[in-house]
Swiss-Prot record:
Pfam families: Ribosomal_L4 (PF00573). The gene is rplD. Keywords: Ribonucleoprotein, Ribosomal protein, RNA-binding, rRNA-binding. The lineage of its organism: Bacteria, Pseudomonadati, Thermodesulfobacteriota, Desulfobacteria, Desulfobacterales. Belongs to the universal ribosomal protein uL4 family. This is Large ribosomal subunit protein uL4. It comes from Desulfosudis oleivorans (strain DSM 6200 / JCM 39069 / Hxd3) (Desulfococcus oleovorans).
Length: 205
């Protein structure tokens, strides 16, 4: 098992914790991470892009002028895709981009993302991350003391923590249940409270 230092909010080491190898020491495969991140981003798409086809555009269906004898190029009705204001050919219509990858693959990708943070020395474990009041300055001071700017911070549900951090750039606070591959990889650092380790074990083992 890997051993990591547990720090307080002043950046001082107060104890150590063991991390299970089955979660924090697995083979990292970029193809698996890519597939899960691609799925997450696809699920976030609104899929509301919409265009009007020839049958949707308002206008007469009458032929503009006779087929032959005018010397001009032949024309159909005003809704022709060739004309300004006409319909769009093969344009987008509202649809869902949602798809899923197997649950085992999603769990494996999460383990890989956590492993990569540990190996890159960008995983910080804190004894607790709580504040007595909602104060952005206090949160920024704690993050700087931990050397974890540009970080994904895992919360144990503390409202003061979430509200103190919501206006800080390049920082995101997530509850442990919302831990996901995309956000772990997006931010340089990952800050975990000690209690979250057991919750992650329960979710992934």
């Amino acid at each position: 098992m890997a051993v990591v230092d547990i720090k307080n909010m002043n950046g001082e080491t107060v104890s150590q914790a063991e991390l299970p190898d089955s979660i924090f020491d697995v083979e990292v495969k970029s193809s698996v991470l890519h597939e899960v991140v691609k799925m997450q981003l696809a699920r976030r798409r609104s899929g509301t892009a919409s265009t009007k086809g020839r049958s949707d555009v308002a206008g007469s269906r009458a032929k503009l002028f006779r087929q032959k004898g005018t010397g001009r190029a032949r024309r159909g009705d005003v809704k022709s895709p060739l004309l300004k204001g006409g319909g769009v050919v093969f344009g987008p219509h509202p649809r869902s981009f949602d798809y899923s990858v197997p649950k085992k693959v999603r769990k494996l990708a999460l383990k890989m993302a956590l492993t990569s943070k540990l190996r890159d020395n960008t995983l910080t474990v804190v004894d607790q991350f709580r504040f007595d009041r909602i104060k952005t300055k206090d949160f920024v001071g704690a993050i700087n003391a931990l050397g974890a700017a540009n970080a994904l911070v895992i919360s144990d549900g503390s409202e003061t923590l979430e509200k103190s951090a919501r206006n800080v750039p390049k920082v995101k606070v997530l509850k442990c249940e919302g831990l996901n591959v995309y956000d772990i990889l997006k931010y340089k650092n990952l800050v975990l409270p000690e209690a979250a380790i057991k919750m992650i074990e329960g979710r992934l083992l």
